[in-house]
Amino acid sequence: MKPLLKENSLIQVKHILKAHQNVKDVVIHTPLQRNDRLSERYECNIYLKREDLQVVRSFKLRGAYHKMKQLSSEQTENGVVCASAGNHAQGVAFSCKHLGIHGKIFMPSTTPRQKVSQVELFGKGFIDIILTGDTFDDVYKSAAECCEAESRTFIHPFDDPDVMAGQGTLAVEILNDIDTEPHFLFASVGGGGLLSGVGTYLKNVSPDTKVIAVEPAGAASYFESNKAGHVVTLDKIDKFVDGAAVKKIGEETFRTLETVVDDILLVPEGKVCTSILELYNECAVVAEPAGALSVAALDLYKDQIKGKNVVCVVSGGNNDIGRMQEMKERSLIFEGLQHYFIVNFPQRAGALREFLDEVLGPNDDITRFEYTKKNNKSNGPALVGIELQNKADYGPLIERMNKKPFHYVEVNKDEDLFHLLI
């Protein structure tokens, strides 16, 4: 991709600078930190823009607050509406309370109680939360109907020039804080609001900086739209990287990204999980899946960034501790260390012992075993999870299984079966 190095008509540097004046006394000027571990690993200078330390633990406050700050007195009196199950809802709720504007926040009925409570906390006394529908489309429809019926203003999570300009204030801070020339900037793309603002500012103030968009491989709405030359809607997505998993990128954000993005990278969800765990264990950074996307993409650019100055936007840190086990599981599977099998065991004494003694390697560990004895049958299936110490142990494990009279199916290699059982 070759971006057009000029301002587009939708969002310009002057809009971002105005937004910076509007939000600077409300949002936290988050730190830009050189990360020694990552810098050593990739033989370059890696800087993390820590939006996980923002007051609502994500960049979303910037765009929501700036948008609401632009409202007329009539719009302020009528109130606002948003549809979100995550960080945008928190940003709108905080802005409602700070600006004294009443807001109605529509969230899916399936939203975890913890997220609902966080939104309530940020907007206490100034918001009503309406839980409705099972999907974002249901929620969006209800929010739109409320806007029309009550003459409220809809605060879009990304496809709005004021929101995009607000998110771009993050780039103002980056260039003010960095003590050298940034050669690369990596940031996540979901709806596209963040990188539309950040990319616009960088391409006009630091035009030699390469702007790299990063998407989850299971929700590549921008990548597919870029390939098609127009916005497309994905049939299905993997919702794991929830802060960046959208079926359709914004129309306005797509137009803007096409003028500022140098490359688009797709990162498998399992790799994202590995990066989340490494950031936590090695750097004491609590990143949500979308927040870890930028760091997770570095392996794909390790040759290009060697010896360079690289900024990674850690876009948020609203991570549910209850998801950590799933993240560890996805990471192990991606790294080739966790494997699942359906093994058809002979229903005779000693069959399991034979499997343990003659199939498992000395460093292999059974992490899951589900077996129900079948009466009047000579064999019975069991779901077996095996964690390897080294990826290279997989081949010998399969060789040993093939030598024994155990018929088996590798669950990892059957996506439908995997999602059904695991």
UniProtKB/Swiss-Prot annotation:
Cite the ACT-like domain residue spans from the record. Answer: 339-413
EC number(s) of the enzyme?
A: 4.3.1.19
Per the record, the pathway is:
Amino-acid biosynthesis; L-isoleucine biosynthesis; 2-oxobutanoate from L-threonine: step 1/1
**Annotated InterPro entries:** IlvA, Ser/Thr_Dehydratase, Ser/Thr_deHydtase_PyrdxlP-BS, TD_ACT-like, TrpB-like_PALP, TrpB-like_PALP_sf
Give me the residues that bind pyridoxal 5'-phosphate, please: N87, G190, G191, G192, G193, L194, S315
- Which Pfam families does the entry mention? PALP, Thr_dehydrat_C
**Key words of the record:** Amino-acid biosynthesis, Branched-chain amino acid biosynthesis, Isoleucine biosynthesis, Lyase, Pyridoxal phosphate
Task: Tell me which cofactor or cofactors this protein depends on.
Answer: pyridoxal 5'-phosphate
Source domain of life: Bacteria
Instruction: Report which reactions are catalysed by this protein.
Output: L-threonine = 2-oxobutanoate + NH4(+)
Q: Under which main EC class is this enzyme filed? A: lyase
- Molecular function, one GO term: pyridoxal phosphate binding
| GO BP, sorted A to Z | isoleucine biosynthetic process; threonine metabolic process
Where does the record place the modification N6-(pyridoxal phosphate)lysine?
Answer: K60
Subunit annotation: Homotetramer.
Q: Function of this protein?
A: Catalyzes the anaerobic formation of alpha-ketobutyrate and ammonia from threonine in a two-step reaction. The first step involved a dehydration of threonine and a production of enamine intermediates (aminocrotonate), which tautomerizes to its imine form (iminobutyrate). Both intermediates are unstable and short-lived. The second step is the nonenzymatic hydrolysis of the enamine/imine intermediates to form 2-ketobutyrate and free ammonia. In the low water environment of the cell, the second step is accelerated by RidA.
- Name of this protein: L-threonine dehydratase biosynthetic IlvA
- The species this protein belongs to is Bacillus subtilis (strain 168)
